[in-house]
Amino acid sequence: MKKDLLNSELHMMKKTFCMFFLAAAVPAAFAYRTSDVSLGGEWFFHMGDVAGGEAVSADTSGWERVKVPHDWAIGKAFDMNYDKQYVQVVQDGEKKARERTGRTGALPTVGAGWYRKTLELPKSESGKRVYIQFDGAMSRAKVWLNGEYVGEWPYGYASFELDLTEYFKFGQPNKLAVRLENPPTASRWYSGAGIFRDVRLVAKPQTHVENWGTYVTTPKISGKSATCRIETSVADFSDSGKKVSVRTSIISPSGKTVAQKTSGVEISGGRGKAVQEIEIKSPELWTLDLPALYTARTEVLSDGEPVDEYFTKFGVRSISYDRDGGFKLNGKRVQFKGVCMHHDLGPIGAAFNVSAARRQLEILKDMGVNAIRTSHNPPAPALLDLCDEMGILAQVEAFDEWKMVKCENGYNKLFDKWAKKDLEAMMRRDRNHPCVVMWSIGNEVPEQTVPEGRKTAKFLADIVRAEDPTRPVTAGCDRNKHAVEHGFVDELDLVGFNYKPFYYKECYDKKPRAIIYGSETASTVSSRGVYHFPTKESKNPWSHDYQVTSYDLACAPWSQVPEDEWKGQDENPFVLGEFVWTGFDYLGEPFPYDGGDYVAKSAYFGAVDLCGFPKDRFYLYRARWRPETETLHVLPHWTWPDRVGQKTPVYCYTNYPKAELFVNGKSMGVREKGGAGKFGKSRLIWEDAVYEPGEIKVVAYSADGKKAAEKTVKTAGEPARLEIKADKKKFGGEELCFVEVSIVDKDGNLCPRADNIIYFSTDGNVKLRALCNGDPTDLTPFGSNYMRAFSGKLLAVLEADGDARGSVKAASGGKGDKAIKSASVKF
């Protein structure tokens, strides 16, 4: 991409008008506008195939009632035999194939499932065109209305629209049927299964804005004004011969209309496009700290009368990339402090929920994260809405696989027919989001290794540039030398390297146009609250408990500990930053316990566990990424009855330059950053600390030697009671409540090795949605009402129909647990 194309502009997010207009309730001039009705809520569902499941007369009396968004697998029992895969993962450096268990989460995602729902629109809507819009359906979706086949869309992560007009009957019940099927060996991680994102029924006037039909940029921005360029695509099925025009109003973040323009549309073959430039005076910029969002209100006029209305969220901001100057947002350099995120939401699975996703992003922001990579697929569009609102940058990724096989039944089966459609759909859906700053066309694709792979990269990159020339094209490259030698990276605007910090300088020298960053870094693994001795760095960790030490010294054979990546960045300031693998633990890929007789269902890679509880590594990144904010974290815990008198190293992760350790009041010396060895710059370490019951205290000092902060960790006594903490008191509907339960001693100290079984009960309209403890080896179903604590903690997810009115109680009822006092919270 030319440098001038890398100087991009404002982008924004389309949001269709989400209120259903009944003709009797609104003025006549508005009755013809688009009505957009969410189909979330109750559907009928049948697990397994059904002969004649599409028929109008299909019997659903034995079907399950579920709420969409829905993941049919997440609440079921785990089984390590589900979707076993026998595969050689070249990307991981494997020389031969081996059996993999738990790769897709050990849950029953494979197979077919049917959904049915009755749709109705009043006769007053007659004359409109009717569409159904899916934000995502996993996978191989086929849709029927009133027994008639409407269409299909196989890529489960793609959003799509199908036209129901021909078969829709106004004023009558319409029978919608959706068949989904997930083949085996189709994914490398937990995909989820079902209609796992939002669905909408949209009735549009004959003349209307097309789906994803606006494209807004800001080619010129100054302190005094911003030029807003809006392309609006209009469909006209009316054959009325009436004059069509578009009136665009710009609404400020405070809700005031600050500019307006009307332009004619030349209709040809039923379609037309308006291109408008509108000046915004004294614009409020979209920034990471103050993510101001404007709205473009688009009205389609027919002979001057409004017939359709469409809303687009966007932000006024500029982005640019430079080989040496880095990434700039509104003219100021920003280093990517990013994480990769799979799409599952832990114990609630792949069924998207805004409150759960918001919670994840809030936790990551506290760590210092300013960017996410949607690994390795288009996300739920509402996730990007959240990034827009919260000031988080996003790399949106399209594919994990092209033509060459990574999974036997993966995207390679779809590429030739669907890649262009899927990529265009992603681009048109997401190109108005100000948070999106780059497009990824692939991750670790084998095409890097063959000369002809460059052609496929060019094919996809050309589609991206045609749809949005304002943002760069990238990909995650793990076969670095092949990608450079075969010219694969020459088709990219930004060269993303996966786990290659020692190659940054070589590529920089070989490719004079290359702009480089770490698209996937670290892959350090750990289990929250688990510590193994002796402490040692390992690239192939294994332990009899199927856990990984949280001293943050273990990683995969293909990867590194965080300090290796940081060295590559610090020595090469041209590097744009990194996207760590991963922000959260996720379902599937339970390395290193991912084969044979191992029992593990979820990954160990996250800086945050599956519950949303930070691991120690969270604070290692926080200390680096938020140097102006106090971080003082001490590990391990100090409850080791079996280690009295033994060396038990103490680590401190802090933004302060030095700290002193005290064991039961005795100083173990001061450690300063900048010491020898790989970890000297980032960790303060007392290798010779000896365990004795009591307490450890770390006192941090500022650069001038003054005491700045202190942190004490005490030896815990016997479990005495449960502590319960809800993240909110008001919830219900789609808003979930996340309840943290901790086992503490009589003085309130966390019992870090407690694994008591905790039972939950609710009353009123409060219901238990899921339980999770963050232990990758625990196969208790998420939908149970009991679960063991892991490292002294447990998460309960609550839901309610309507505003929550009731309570939740947590009690330990296992053998010998009678002395542990229960806890509850009322809503």
Question: Model regions: which residues?
Answer:
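Extended carbohydrate-recognition surfaces in non-catalytic/accessory domains of CAZymes
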Residues: 32-133, 192-195, 584, 642-646
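Accessory beta-strand-rich segments of carbohydrate-active enzymes
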Residues: 39, 47-48, 105-215, 237-238, ...
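Short flexible loop/turn segments that cap and initiate beta-strands
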Residues: 58-59, 241-247, 260, 288-295, ...
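Extended substrate-binding grooves/exosites of carbohydrate-active enzymes
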Residues: 68-78, 153, 198, 206, ...
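Short proline/glycine- and polar residue-rich coil/turn motifs
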Residues: 153-156, 168-170, 264-272, 676-680, ...
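Short, hydrophobic beta-strand segments
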Residues: 164-166, 276-286, 684-691, 782-802
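Extended acidic/polar, glycine-enriched regions
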Residues: 168-171, 231-322, 686-688, 692-693, ...
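Beta-strand-rich structural segments
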Residues: 230-234, 299, 650-653, 699-700, ...
